[in-house]
């Protein structure tokens, strides 16, 4: 029998209950929300995200998240969230509204989920359906390799796609991930990524760059640049799809111009 889908209608908000909260590190948490029954799945195609909405200080706040669980998981959905605490980022003294709200939630509290949302769906075996915009029908792109550039929390949609590819032994798509963070301790989901790399080294290539590198650091330092793209993403000759997710300035100033210099045409670049 097909499992019941939680997100039946993308226009309806579904309240889900917090059932577990795990401290991953100083500012990262894993939140587990119960689906309506133990037999339910979330119903989120690979490549799509959900929106959380909550009334915070009298205002409706809505933020996109990509779960780290999948439709293989019944009865729950997991989100890994970086909490932006107030008074820790000079530019954002108030911190992150939604992440601090999640941090303040108690077991048994509910929050509203809505989705699926997004312009890309991974259909398996190298096949991506991408809508140029909300009104268009999807264009199918089939590739042998995928380049991925993620910044900070932008890793979550990449992990979702990587996991979908790696879990199918008949999917021979090769993923090359370049993952940028401020410091080594900011690397979100590092254990999960390294486990995947160790299990699937032929199909999953992983490279980090950090703004501030520790003394003995085996990877790159600094912003994403042309050299990193040349060295750690598939070559343009393979006609890969290049996926990006991260802060808008990273995509606009670090990714797109350098991808173009290396020879990756805009038509094959997609930003989540």
UniProtKB/Swiss-Prot annotation:
One of its GO terms (biological process) is cholesterol biosynthetic process. SUPFAM superfamilies: Ferredoxin reductase-like, C-terminal NADP-linked domain (SSF52343), Riboflavin synthase domain-like (SSF63380). GO terms for molecular function: cytochrome-b5 reductase activity, acting on NAD(P)H; FAD binding; flavin adenine dinucleotide binding. It is an enzyme of class 1 (oxidoreductase). The modification N6-acetyllysine is found at residues 13, 21, 91. The keyword GTP-binding does not apply. Its EC number is 1.6.2.2. Its cofactor is FAD. Changing residue 66 to V: 10% of wild-type kcat values. Changing residue 66 to A: Similar properties to wild-type. It catalyses: 2 Fe(III)-[cytochrome b5] + NADH = 2 Fe(II)-[cytochrome b5] + NAD(+) + H(+). It is a lipid-anchor. Changing residue 97 to A: Little effect on absorption or CD spectra. Changing residue 49 to A: Similar properties to wild-type. Residues 11-123 form the FAD-binding FR-type domain. It comes from the Eukaryota. InterPro entries: CBR-like, Cbr1-like_FAD-bd_dom, FAD-bd_FR_type, Flavoprot_Pyr_Nucl_cyt_Rdtase, FNR_nucleotide-bd, OxRdtase_FAD/NAD-bd, Riboflavin_synthase-like_b-brl. It holds the Pfam family FAD_binding_6. PANTHER family: NADH-CYTOCHROME B5 REDUCTASE (PTHR19370), NADH-CYTOCHROME B5 REDUCTASE 3 (PTHR19370:SF121). Component of a complex composed of cytochrome b5, NADH-cytochrome b5 reductase (CYB5R3) and MTARC2. Interacts with MTLN; the interaction is required to maintain cellular lipid composition and leads to stimulation of mitochondrial respiratory complex I activity. This is NADH-cytochrome b5 reductase 3. The lineage of its organism: Eukaryota, Metazoa, Chordata, Craniata, Vertebrata.
């Amino acid at each position: 029998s097909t499992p019941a889908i939680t997100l039946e209608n993308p226009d309806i908000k579904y309240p889900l209950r917090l059932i577990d909260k795990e401290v991953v590190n100083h500012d990262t948490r894993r939140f587990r929300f119960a689906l309506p029954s133990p037999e339910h799945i979330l119903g989120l195609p690979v490549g799509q995200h959900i929106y959380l909405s909550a009334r915070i200080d009298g205002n409706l706040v809505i933020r996109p998240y990509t779960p780290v669980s999948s439709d293989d998981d019944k009865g729950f959905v997991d989100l890994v969230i970086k909490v932006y605490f107030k008074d820790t980022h000079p530019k954002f003294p108030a911190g992150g509204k939604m992440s601090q709200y999640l941090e303040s939630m108690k077991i048994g509290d509910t929050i509203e989920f809505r989705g699926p949302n997004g312009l890309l769906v991974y259909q398996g075996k190298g096949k991506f359906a991408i809508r140029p915009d909300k009104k268009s029908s999807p264009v199918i792109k089939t590739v042998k390799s995928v380049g991925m550039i993620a910044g900070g929390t932008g890793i979550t949609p990449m992990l979702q796609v990587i996991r979908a590819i790696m879990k199918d032994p008949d999917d021979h798509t090769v993923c090359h991930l370049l993952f940028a963070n401020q410091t080594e301790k900011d690397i979100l989901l590092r254990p999960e990524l390294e486990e995947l790399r160790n299990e699937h080294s032929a199909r999953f290539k992983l490279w980090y760059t950090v703004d501030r590198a520790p003394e003995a650091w085996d990877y790159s330092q600094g912003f994403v640049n042309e050299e990193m793209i040349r060295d750690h993403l598939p070559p343009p000759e393979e006609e890969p799809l290049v996926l990006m997710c991260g802060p808008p300035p990273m995509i606009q100033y670090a990714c797109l111009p350098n991808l173009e210099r290396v020879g990756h045409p805009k038509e094959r670049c997609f930003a989540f």
